[in-house]
Amino acid sequence: MKLDILAIGVHPDDVELGCGGLLLVEKSNQKKVGIVDLTHGELGTRGTAKTRNEEAAEAAKILALDTRENLGFADGFFKNDEEHQRNVISIIRKYQPEIVICNA
């Protein structure tokens, strides 16, 4: 599936907090939109990984996302190395987005 916009966040809820409004507007403009979370947010202080994944699924419904995936990287422990880069590259190739949004 080709996406117009792919937003990548480190933790579930990063994308929603950073650009959820933009994604909602673009969905109303008939754009195909997806989110990829790199981790399950297991080190976060705002709930367990299970809770955050449940909330991410609910947010996907509210935002009417075309897809949402989680790459399952270890929160706080993944590196900017070839292995992790290849995972992200494969997602970008899979969805061939026109626009990629990511947080720093």
What are these regions (language model features)?
Residues 98-104:
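Acidic beta-strand-to-loop metal/phosphate-binding motif
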Residues 1-95:
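Active-site rim/loop-helix segments in enzyme catalytic domains that contact anionic ligands
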